Amino acid sequence: MKKIFALALIAPLLISCSSKKNAENAYNEAWIKDTNGFDILMGQFAHNIENIWGFNEVLIAGPKDYVKYTDQYQTRSHINFDEGTITVETIAGTEPAARLRRAIITTLLMGDDPGSIDLYSDVNDIQISREPFLYGQVVDNTGQPIRWEGRASKFADYLLQTHLKSRSNGLRIIYSVTINLVPNHLDKRAHKYIGMVRQASRKYGVDESLILAIMQTESSFNPYAVSHADALGLMQVVQHSAGKDVFRSQGKWGTPSRSYLFDPQSNIDTGTAYLAMLNNVYLGGITNPTSRRYAVITAYNGGAGSVLRVFSSDKDQAVNIINQLSPGDVYETLTNRHPSAESRRYLYKVNTAQKMYRRK
């Protein structure tokens, strides 16, 4: 009788554990399918571009590069947020000037809703906005910012008359126009998100300067940011890792959707929540706040586990070693001994950017 009673108590727990395990397995299977599906999509997308533009002319959107194809992949707009340039190109054999003109106008006047534009297709889904994303970041030949279609059209005509260039890919002629963004374009983009950053900073107790430094390093404040790893948005949040961790900590099931992470406020909230998790949970045992900040920055790029393994394969021992080192030694160790060159550079970039934002 006691055995039956004990089984009666344990059975619900076993069922609960089993259902959780089944749900986790189902989630992992879905993640694998999503990842494989994304890889297939990217491969087909690159193939479509290569067929028209040639192998050396394949250009795909990235964290700091907005690239949108239209006209059956024959026309593209590329905003390089690092270099501060807009390049509009066409390889079309018919009416290249008209195609360029249309692409220039729509690029200058597009809105700032990344969820409305599919960067992995040639669908012309760019909507002209009364509040263009690039407003204030680019000026016309008279030095005026561009908000309305009339001014954008006149500027496009001017560019085609005075700045049109051509080159050959070996088989076809590519026509292009390049526009420079204003010198302080980075600050102008950052200013758009200050209110959202301030709100997330207060909510999660993360320094505003760190959030801004992460955003600059990850995307150069490009809300359309994507990556080969399928990291999304301003803070380059990966749905199935950081996004999943944050949702779990907030009592939510699954992962944030692409549309959720392309929303600037949701992206900043999720990225900042993850920074707080790294600081308070995964790396919370590091006592010196500066040392912990260096660890958190590096972990945002390469994971908390890889940070700790730089010091020891045992997590507790790694924390003890870090706590015995000066912040300067922790910084030197992470920027010289972390196995990932990207993570080593990442700490330097974010730390440098954060110093700049602290002075503002």
Curated annotation (Swiss-Prot):
Protein EC: 4.2.2.n1
Keywords: Cell outer membrane, Cell wall biogenesis/degradation, Lipoprotein, Lyase, Membrane, Palmitate, Signal
Lipidated positions per record (S-diacylglycerol cysteine): C17
Name of one Pfam family that matches: Mltc_N
CDD domains recorded: LT_MltC_MltE
Membrane topology field: Lipid-anchor
Signal peptide: 1-16
Residues carrying lipid (N-palmitoyl cysteine): C17
Database matches in InterPro entries: Lysozyme-like_dom_sf, Murein_transglycosylaseC, Murein_transglycosylaseC_N, Transglyc_AS, Transglycosylase_SLT_dom_1
Catalytic reaction(s) noted: Exolytic cleavage of the (1->4)-beta-glycosidic linkage between N-acetylmuramic acid (MurNAc) and N-acetylglucosamine (GlcNAc) residues in peptidoglycan, from either the reducing or the non-reducing ends of the peptidoglycan chains, with concomitant formation of a 1,6-anhydrobond in the MurNAc residue
Bilayer-spanning residue ranges: none
Family matches, as Gene3D superfamilies: 1.10.530.10
Coiled coil region boundaries: none
Biological process, per Gene Ontology: cell wall macromolecule catabolic process; cell wall organization; peptidoglycan metabolic process
Domain of life, per lineage: Bacteria
Locations listed in the record: Cell outer membrane
Alphabetized NCBIfam families for the sequence: PRK11671.1 (NF008670)
Function: Murein-degrading enzyme. May play a role in recycling of muropeptides during cell elongation and/or cell division.
Listed HAMAP family: MltC (MF_01616)
Family: Belongs to the transglycosylase Slt family.
Protein name listed in UniProt: Membrane-bound lytic murein transglycosylase C
Organism: Cronobacter sakazakii (strain ATCC BAA-894)
Classification lineage: Bacteria, Pseudomonadati, Pseudomonadota, Gammaproteobacteria, Enterobacterales
